[in-house]
Structure formats: C-alpha cells, structure tokens
Amino acid sequence: MSSTDLSAKLFADACSVIPGGVNSPVRAFSSVGGTPRFITSANGCWLTDADGNRYVDLVCSWGPMILGHAHPAVVEAVQRAAADGLSFGAPTPSEAELAREIIDRVAPVELIRLVNSGTEATMSAIRLARGFTGRAKIVKFSGCYHGHSDALLADAGSGVATLGLPSSPGVTGAAAADTIVLPYNNVPAVEEVFGRFGDEIACVITEASPGNMGTVPPLPGFNAELRRITAAHGALLILDEVMTGFRVSRAGWYGVDPVEADLFTFGKVMSGGLPAAAFGGRAEVMNRLAPLGPVYQAGTLSGNPVAMAAGLATLRAADDAAYATLDVNADRLAGLIGDALTEAGVAHQIPRAGNMFSVFFGAEPVTDFAAARATETWRFPAFFHGLLDAGVYPPPSAYECWFVSTALDDDAFDKIAAALPGAARAAAQATA
C-alpha cells in the first residue's frame, strides 16, 4: 500500500475543527475503517490524493460526474460564468435555460423551481404537496433516502443505513408523526395504509429507483401502482430522481419507466458537480408556490449562475452517445466484479438500475431494505480496502451505489481488472 501519511495528518487536523473530520458522514470511512483519502485533484476518471496516490474513481462524487472530472466544456462554462460574477441575488438568464433543459427531457414536468441541494428539493416538494392537498400525512419507504430533513429521515438509507441508525437523534416525534414508513416494493402495504388514511395522505414519495440502500430497483409495475393508488385517493406522487435523474438516461428514470408523477426532484447530474438541485411537475401544483401562491419557498443562492453554467454544460454534453458509453462501462465493470467474486467463491448479487449498480454479498436477491440489511455486509470492508490499496476508489459503504463515467478508459479498466482478484479473495476470507 502506498503512503497515506498526509491524508492521515489532514484528517486529524480536520477532526479538530469539523465534527468527525468530514462534512458528510460516509466520507469518514466509518463503516469500512482506515484513513479517509483527502483528494486534492481529479481529471477524467482519476483521483489524486494529498499523498500523490492515484485512484480510478468509481464514486463520481456520488453520481454527478457522468462525464468525468474537469471535463473541458464544463470547466470552460464555469470559468466564463465566474468571470461575470459569482452571485447576484436576482434573476439570471441561465436559470430559465436550465429549467427548460430539464422540462424538455422529462415530459410530465411543466414548471421547475431551482434550489441548492437534494434535501431542499425533497423538503420543498413535500411542503408543496401538503399545501396543495391540504393534508398532513406522507408515505415513504424503508431504506429510501430523500435528504436529511426531519420528516424524511425515518428508516432512511444512505448514511443513516451506513451508520446503522434507525433515524437520527434530534428528530422529534412530532416532526415524524405524520410520516408513514412502509416496506419497499410492497403494493399491498400501500393499499392497506391508503385504506386506513387515504383522505389524510398528502403524498407518496419514493426514489424512482432506490440507490441509497444499495441499488434496489422497483419491481416491474411498482411505480405505476403507486401512481394508480395515489390518483385514486387524491394524493400526489413524488418521484425522487436526485440520483437517477439524467444519469440512467437522457430523461432519467422517467426515460426507463415513464410513470407520470405529479412532482419530480432532481440534483447531482443537473448541477454538473456544483451545489444545485430542483423540483418540478404539473403547473397546477407548481403554481401554488410563492410568489404566485401561498406555499413559501426561497433561497439566497438558488439559481446561482456558476452552478447553472455547470449544469447546462453537463446536460448539453450528455448526448445519446454519452449514455451509450455509460451503459457499456457499467456492463464492463459489473462483469469484471462478478467474474472475480465468482472465481473467489463469494456468493454475491449485483443489482442494476441502468448504469448504476451495487455489490451485495449473499445468495438471496435484494428487493427491499430488510433484504439489503440481511446481506453479508461484513465482507465489504475487506473488499473495499483490497480495491483501494490497489488504486481503485469504490464507494466506502455497502449501502451505496457504484458510479461510472464516460471517462473510464482501457487503462482504468486494466487497473480495475488487476485489483479485483485480490479484493475478491479478501472478501472470501473475511469473517463476521
């Protein structure tokens, strides 16, 4: 293993001024152990840490970097926008341009409101659904993560799952009292709760294809059934495409499974790697937002011109050829991983959602959060470090997606192929 002394020093320094040394928990390597790598630069599919070690990037900033890092068109757009000013607190032309780009890609979306993070997008969509329907209760699914607003942290995935938390201290009973949590991919459970509370439920929110309990795609027809049930009871359907949006296809998950939700949330890819997100949907619903309607939502940096430039440049470069390359790269990577684990005698599942996937250890298919938690997650740290020590940077959690970019090339795949046999043997030798 190459030296990580400087990363270790930087982590210790960060711990003296930042809780846990990181600004998002999964970055601390809490579930896999070892020294978090402090990244100082990235280009294409390669990361470089403070010690000068290079890694093939299979995290892609948790999804946004579909074109790879420092893509020339994105860098040029950001530099040009920054030269004109960083933030104005006033409308800018690029806000409407990015909104139009999203609307053109996702047919049910008629109006867009831009915000700063996926958490803001889902939180605001929930408030809007409640304001539009005049109802209080919301339905979410176990293992689905919709950001860290209080009402949506109950039995969530992502970092909450990684740390083994049922929710979070500080989320009061009152904040979560109107949140109903159901098992994922279970239509009868949804029908039952609507039978009891149908006229009190404002909305159902679900990840369009979950990626925060690992990749656990919806069973065929599940999202369509949610659409049918919510429509029958006058509730709204919110499809959270913060992760899948503009990654798995030009139209996100809607391009794979065209269910016409009332509201969609977006983030990650649409921001080009800078802080931006959005929610949008039917004009009848969106027009209830201030300044047209009574549902308040605002943000000092919403529609930031530099973030808009990054998002526009990314989406405009993400053409059909780019999505074909993403799919080919995901096929190639998943195939290499599967072959190595099979050769090492490790039972595994590699569920896919387009070019997103996860690696679960165990023989049983994973269709919900309970099944994800029942996998042999204790094998993951050994597998993770086997790859990391060989120059491949996978997600540092068993409950997160693996992401590819169009920048992955033969040199990167050669590095991955060389690293996998040892990592697979380490997973095979791991003990609970």
UniProtKB/Swiss-Prot annotation:
Pathway assigned in UniProt: Porphyrin-containing compound metabolism; protoporphyrin-IX biosynthesis; 5-aminolevulinate from L-glutamyl-tRNA(Glu): step 2/2
Molecular function GO labels: glutamate-1-semialdehyde 2,1-aminomutase activity; pyridoxal phosphate binding; transaminase activity
Subcellular location: Cytoplasm
Top EC class for this record: isomerase
Matches recorded under Pfam families: Aminotran_3 (PF00202)
One Gene Ontology CC term in the entry: cytoplasm
Modification N6-(pyridoxal phosphate)lysine, positions: 268
Biological process terms in GO annotation: protoporphyrinogen IX biosynthetic process
Enzyme Commission no: 5.4.3.8
Reactions catalysed: (S)-4-amino-5-oxopentanoate = 5-aminolevulinate
Cofactor field: pyridoxal 5'-phosphate
Predominant localisation class: cytoplasm
Keywords carried by this UniProt record: Cytoplasm, Isomerase, Porphyrin biosynthesis, Pyridoxal phosphate
Family recorded in the similarity comment: Belongs to the class-III pyridoxal-phosphate-dependent aminotransferase family. HemL subfamily.
Listed PANTHER family: GLUTAMATE-1-SEMIALDEHYDE 2,1-AMINOMUTASE (PTHR43713), GLUTAMATE-1-SEMIALDEHYDE 2,1-AMINOMUTASE 1, CHLOROPLASTIC-RELATED (PTHR43713:SF3)
Quaternary structure and partners: Homodimer.
NCBIfam families the UniProt entry points to: hemL, PRK00062.1
Protein name (Swiss-Prot/TrEMBL): Glutamate-1-semialdehyde 2,1-aminomutase
Organism annotation: Mycolicibacterium vanbaalenii (strain DSM 7251 / JCM 13017 / BCRC 16820 / KCTC 9966 / NRRL B-24157 / PYR-1)
Lineage: Bacteria, Bacillati, Actinomycetota, Actinomycetes, Mycobacteriales
